[in-house]
Amino acid sequence: MTDTQNKNYIIALDQGTTSSRAIIFDRDANVVSTAQSEFVQHYPQAGWVEHDPMEIFATQTACMTKALAQADLHHDQIAAIGITNQRETTVIWERDTGRPIYNAIVWQCRRSTEICQQLKRDGLEEYIKDTTGLVLDPYFSGSKVKWILDHVEGSRERARKGELMFGTIDTWLIWKFTGGKVHVTDYTNASRTMLFNIHTLEWDQRMLDVLDIPREILPEVKSSSEVYGHSKSGIPIAGIAGDQQAALFGQMCVEPGQAKNTYGTGCFLLMNTGKKAVKSAHGMLTTIGCGPRGEVAYALEGAVFNGGSTVQWLRDELKLINDALDTEYFAGKVKDSNGVYLVPAFTGLGAPYWDPYARGALFGLTRGVKVDHIIRAALESIAYQTRDVLDAMQQDSGERLKSLRVDGGAVANNFLMQFQADILGTHVERPQMRETTALGAAFLAGLAIGFWSSLDELRNKAVIERVFEPACEEAHREKLYAGWQKAVARTRDWEPHENEE
């Protein structure tokens, strides 16, 4: 425990894919100050995405300084730092100099596809699923680490000698903030590397051998809520969680059956499954989240590819609306979608269908269909896809969905939130505080140092602004959802497979 009596603030560092942010919270979990700084995206080849790790550190440091200045605060008034980060993005740097040997390879980058194909040919797909909880994909850090060691001359030998260090963005920032004293990650970030056994909670030797990654470069793995070290100005760094897991904790989803949906371009759904690591039969990821004290708890994760992007399509390509905010007004002008379903499978279907050959379609068109019906069907598609994922999670886990906590831009749309409650038959809870990812990191740091005493105290801080209760008869709900399932079935396997062309 740290003396927090005269230190009344926690700073959360939210290191994202396109920007670094710093958010300062007071003891009542109110936002006191925020600062944000974007950084350059590098695309050296088609499908490749990189960041400059030094720029990430510089922007994150600048945001911290700016947030403090805006609130007229000094370092010695900050009780702790919590860090949340874009997951999977991979950095390797020199132990002595702290200089990266290559740019950070970002989670979206597909350059290590061939490495993953080879693992598939070697029959490792099931082992990876069973051990790491993940699907075999270039998304995760393991194949990115191998790619750097394969392509930077002499790096593997240097790694074996202990001259190099690997980390996801949390690890990199902590190394820099502590002046090279601490090489650590947390369980949530480790669980996204494809190198970590989520059952034994240790780095997996077989995966390290298969990818030829020397153990010497790996960070120590710790819980998401403890003091890892101190910044150069003496502030304890006391919380770490990957962005989606931080949002799950910030939403207080710490008991089995509690779930959150982040409505962004796509949707990220996580459901807490407690002490049970559930293997999904529907292509969900099994990942590590946080229990009530920041300890290990398991979660299922599923993604919807097209959420907010469907509304962007209505605005930018079809020109049916001028602003995404207009959708609520138009959807509310009609009593239903008039039998119209929009399946936004623009890039195929994600969980639980996993059909890259599906394509988008509008169904149920008649002469009576107006623009308002199509706009309404677009919003409804986001809620239907969310139900697809949550139904699969409930089947996988045997846990009944208690409620759905929501965050992200689209939660301001009252029509969408009400329809979400109706189609799930579960109440949807919208928090007053929209900064749930940063809040999760702040909560984890604050609990570690006694800034907040317990989860019960935090529950009082996590104020729910509005609860949307289902207002739809079960028979009608299931009829609507059956129509959606029929529409989805018609979009499946639309594109010819490559070998058929």
From Swiss-Prot:
Origin: domain of life: Bacteria
Annotated binding of ADP, by residue: T17, R21, T265, G308, G409, N413
Name of a matching Pfam family: FGGY_N
One cellular component (GO) term of this entry: cytosol
Regulation: Inhibited by fructose 1,6-bisphosphate (FBP).
Keywords, comma-separated and alphabetical: ATP-binding, Glycerol metabolism, Kinase, Nucleotide-binding, Transferase
Binding site for sn-glycerol 3-phosphate: T17, R87, E88, Y139, D243
This enzyme's EC code(s): 2.7.1.30
UniProt KW Nucleotide-binding keyword: yes
SUPFAM superfamilies: Actin-like ATPase domain (SSF53067)
GO MF terms, alphabetically ordered: ATP binding; glycerol kinase activity
PROSITE patterns the UniProt entry points to: FGGY_KINASES_1 (PS00933), FGGY_KINASES_2 (PS00445)
Class of this enzyme: transferase
Residues involved in ATP binding: T17, T18, S19, T265, G308, Q312, G409
GO BP terms, alphabetized: glycerol catabolic process; glycerol metabolic process; glycerol-3-phosphate metabolic process
UniProt binding sites for glycerol: R87, E88, Y139, D243, Q244
Pathway(s) per entry: Polyol metabolism; glycerol degradation via glycerol kinase pathway; sn-glycerol 3-phosphate from glycerol: step 1/1
Catalytic activity: glycerol + ATP = sn-glycerol 3-phosphate + ADP + H(+)
Family, similarity comment: Belongs to the FGGY kinase family.
Known role: Key enzyme in the regulation of glycerol uptake and metabolism. Catalyzes the phosphorylation of glycerol to yield sn-glycerol 3-phosphate.
Name under which the protein is recorded: Glycerol kinase
Origin species: Pseudomonas syringae pv. tomato (strain ATCC BAA-871 / DC3000)
